[in-house]
Structure formats: C-alpha cells, structure tokens
C-alpha cells in the first residue's frame, strides 16, 4: 500500500468513527458489488466499500475460506480477522451474489464476526424477466434497510439520493471527456485514487474532490511519450499496485474498464424510482458481473480502436469465478483476430511478486514498441 493510500485509510478510520459518534449506521459493501448505495444513503446510512487488500490479509483469510477462493475475498475476510480499525466499525454487511467470492466472504463475516447481514440478489442476464426480478429484489432490499435503519425511506429521500449520485456520475463523465479531448492529463493511478475517495469517504466527499480535481486540470497538458494501454478485467482495490507497476514500466493506462475505473460511471440513473435504479444497475456494461454479455468483447475492441491505444492489458485475480478459462480463450481469439497487442496478467495477493509482473510487462512493452 502506498503512503497516500495508507494516509487515506487512516483518515477514513477517523471519519467512520466520527460518523458512529453521530449515530450513523455503517454498511459494509464488497467493493465490486452491484449494490445501490442510493438506498443506503437515503436511509441515513454510510456505505463503506470494503476495498482493502495487501499485507497478510489474504493468508489470514484462509482460516475461513479455501485457498482456491479468490484472494480479494480472502483478503476481505482477513481484514476482519486482523481486526482492521476501519472494518470493525461496520454495523451491517451487504451479502450479495456478485460472485462466489462475495457469497462466501460475506457469509463468513456475518457468521464469525457477528455482523448483521442484509441480502441482495442480482440476475446475470439482461432480459425483461431479469429486470422484473431485480425491481422486486430492490424493493425487498429497501424494506430490509428500512427495518435495520428504524425508519422508512420516503420518495423524496430516494430522489435526493439518486440525484446526488448522478451529480458524481456527471462530474466523472466530464473528467473522462476532458481526459479524452486533452490527451489524458491524469495517470491511471491518479484516476484510480479518485475512486478510492468514494470507496472510503462516501459520495459527498467524492463530489467535492472531483470538483477540485476538475478545477486543477485547467491549463494543464499531458506529459506524453508513453505507450497507451486499455486496462480491463478484475478491478484494482486499495493495496493492489498493479496499475502502478504498469505505469512505472512506461505505459499510461488511458482507460480502466473495471469497477475501479471512471468509465464504470458512463451512464445516469434516469428517474427517481426503484425501477430506474434497477434499469441502471442491470445495464452496467463495465461490471464484471455482466462480463458474459455478448457486447463485452465487441465493446472492448471498439474502445481500443477509438482511443488509439497501443495495447490491452487484461487483469485477472487468481481463482476469480467471473473469469473462467473460456473467457480467456474467447478474449485471446477476439483480440488475435483483430491483431490487437494483448497481455493477460493473473495475480494472487500475497503470492505473486512484483518482479514476476515487471518481467512480463517489460516483454509486453518491447512487443508494442
């Protein structure tokens, strides 16, 4: 974990403790989960994205989850076992079905660390029946959050929350537009840090930070001279230095098409109802939960060509249930047919060394030069 990330976590601990003193309920959410934070915010709660990895948290997680479980899930459980000052303030854990890792991790956290769990289930298809199911599921989720919060969520409170989150999405979209038009002023690591602000400090702090960053871009220009790459696949939580290693090798990550990327927020919630929320989250194109949608690979190659990138780096956390070998094979075939330079990286927190990744990145750089 970098010095900046360490300081962010320290500051987040202080904020969460202050919120607890104000009788705010803290809801832990697996960082990659498709959980409508709007409902938690509307209920007066604070959604905290569980996004910490690194240290010996993954190995500690083996006490609860098999070593063949993805190391992000194991790291999350390991943080609880290590009595993380941030995570020990959590009042409820949102238990979703984003992936097998989330299912297992949230079950262990609730059972062994005695934290209330609130269930939410998402479909994996984009059909009319899936939308109907999700609308009903979000209504159940809303009722469960209301019961835990001790009061109902009014229509006005939900509308206010949706508009606030849409404001953040508009700011992110504006930033992406400036990045594209001006030649990518911010590095991939800097863009990643913007999302970490949201994960740790919440929607209001994220909005203020984005406004400051946008103002700071005025009059700035890109440094240039680096090979531009598209980053896709698994997200990069706090403590994962993969994008830092990529950029240290002379690349510039111009698009991060994961749940830790700005392009994840390319659309808005159109309306102020549960139905509007369901449509938004079901159609999240860059969500790993929807990785098997037919448009994913077509969309990836289209973005590559439109951005004039030099290559694609596809990142997979080892044992991730969302990226089986069939995905790797299909992706490799698609990119080979298009003659697109491509590197697939697989990593396990606590096991894969930086030196191993640096060697592969250097070879890829030589290929695209």
Question: What annotation goes with each model-predicted range?
Answer:
Residues 328-369:
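Peripheral docking tails and interdomain loops at the edges
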Residues 66-84, 289-302:
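Glycine-rich, highly charged phosphate/nucleotide-binding loops
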Residues 293-338:
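C-terminal hydrophobic structural anchor segments
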Residues 75-147:
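Acidic/His-rich segments in extracytoplasmic proteins that coordinate ligands and/or metal ions
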Residues 2-27, 139, 143-268, 282, ...:
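A charged, amphipathic alpha-helical module
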Residues 10-20, 28-30, 36-38, 57-62, ...:
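Metallocofactor- and cofactor-centric catalytic cores in central/energy metabolism, strongly enriched
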Residues 29-37, 96-102, 232-239, 318-326, ...:
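Gly/Ser/Thr-rich loops at beta-strand to alpha-helix junctions
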Residues 33-34, 38-53, 60, 232-303:
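Redox- and metal-dependent alpha/beta enzyme cores, enriched for Fe-S-associated oxidoreductases
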């Amino acid at each position: 974990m970098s010095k900046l990330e360490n300081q962010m976590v320290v500051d987040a601990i202080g904020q969460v403790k202050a919120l607890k003193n104000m009788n705010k309920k803290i809801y832990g959410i697996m960082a990659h989960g498709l959980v409508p934070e709007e409902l938690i915010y509307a209920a007066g709660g604070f959604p905290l994205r569980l996004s910490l990895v690194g240290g010996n948290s993954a190995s500690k997680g083996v006490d609860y989850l098999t070593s063949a479980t993805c190391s992000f899930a194991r790291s999350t459980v390991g943080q609880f076992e290590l009595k993380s000052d941030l995570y020990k303030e959590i009042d409820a854990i949102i238990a979703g079905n984003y992936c097998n890792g989330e299912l297992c991790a949230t079950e262990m956290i609730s059972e062994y660390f005695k934290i209330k769990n609130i269930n939410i289930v998402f479909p994996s298809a984009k059909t009319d029946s899936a939308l109907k199911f999700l609308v009903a599921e979000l209504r159940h989720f809303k009722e469960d959050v209301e019961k835990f919060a001790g009061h109902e969520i009014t229509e006005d409170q939900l509308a206010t929350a949706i508009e606030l989150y849409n404001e953040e999405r508009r700011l992110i979209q504006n930033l992406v537009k400036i990045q594209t038009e001006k030649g990518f002023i911010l590095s991939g690591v800097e863009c990643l840090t913007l999302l970490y602000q949201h994960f740790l400090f919440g929607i209001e702090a994220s909005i203020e930070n984005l406004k400051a960053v946008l103002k700071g871009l005025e009059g700035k220009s890109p440094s240039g001279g680096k090979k531009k790459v598209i980053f896709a696949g698994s997200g990069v939580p706090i403590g994962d230095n993969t994008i830092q290693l990529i950029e240290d090798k002379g690349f510039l990550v111009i698009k991060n098409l994961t749940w830790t990327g700005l392009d994840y927020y390319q659309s808005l919630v159109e309306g102020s109802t549960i139905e509007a929320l369901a449509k938004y989250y079901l159609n999240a194109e860059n969500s790993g939960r929807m990785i098997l949608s037919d448009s994913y690979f077509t969309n990836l190659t289209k973005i590559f060509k439109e951005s004039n990138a030099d290559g694609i780096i596809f990142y997979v956390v080892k044992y991730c249930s969302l990226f089986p070998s069939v995905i790797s094979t299909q992706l490799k075939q698609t990119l080979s047919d298009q003659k697109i330079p491509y590197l697939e990286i697989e990593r396990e927190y606590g096991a894969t060394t930086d030196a191993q990744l640096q060697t592969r990145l250097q070879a890829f750089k030589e290929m695209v030069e």
